[in-house]
Regions:
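Polytopic alpha-helical membrane-helix bundles and their juxtamembrane interface segments
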Residues: 1-205
């Protein structure tokens, strides 16, 4: 239940962020990148559910039904495609943050009020208006994290970089975990309980 609650919160966060970063539209890839966390979480939740089915809940007789077997492997393949997309999306997000554009001739956030921009810090977006600009940042150097849409200051940019790197590393770690589970399921299906691979997996865990 906690996983589902967490999942719903991720969806809400992605929707809120996309309502700002994608307000001018974008390509399908841009949209999927905006919902990278939702896609990533969906894929690994489905995969974990499939592993549970295969390992503990479904009989060998059920798995030997050709149509069912193919359908399950097709779903699993799609999930891995989505996870590969997540690696790409988080990599691009991090890369873009390493190559942001600094705003020239701007030394105060309030100077940006007429431009209808948003300010981001710690993944939280705030509209820059005459009141909020006084409290959002006291720094004098600003960067576009989303060109002509979202800005942040130096400390905010460093925080966004760190968060993006954590997201990238997290999805890579989950891929390693899922690969380990795949091997365990493969060995389980063949009644292999001993050997170098089994010992290695136990040590890795």
């Amino acid at each position: 239940s906690l996983l589902l609650i967490n999942f719903v919160l991720y969806i809400i966060d992605d929707i809120r962020a996309a309502s700002i970063t994608m307000k001018d539209g974008g390509s399908i890839l841009d949209w999927t990148q905006s919902f990278a966390t939702t896609i990533d979480e969906s894929a690994w939740l489905i995969l974990l559910f499939l592993f549970e089915l295969e390992t503990y809940l479904l009989s060998d007789k059920t798995w030997n039904i050709p149509i069912f077997n193919r359908a399950m492997y097709l779903v699993r393949a799609f999930c891995y495609v989505f996870l590969a997309h997540s690696v790409y999306a988080f990599s691009m997000i991090y890369y873009d943050l390493l190559n942001v554009e600094q705003l020239i001739n701007v030394s105060n956030l309030c100077e940006l009020v007429p431009l209808d921009l948003s300010f981001i810090r710690n993944l939280s977006y705030s509209v820059i208006d005459a009141e909020s600009c006084l409290n959002l940042s006291m720094e004098n150097v600003f960067y576009y994290t989303e060109p002509n849409i979202v800005v942040t200051d130096t400390s905010g940019l460093n925080l966004e970089k760190n968060l993006a790197l954590v997201d990238l590393l997290e999805v890579l770690v989950w891929l390693m975990i899922l690969a380990t589970i795949e091997v365990m399921v493969w060995l389980h299906d063949r009644s292999i309980t001993r050997g170098i691979i089994i010992n290695f997996i136990k040590i890795s865990k």
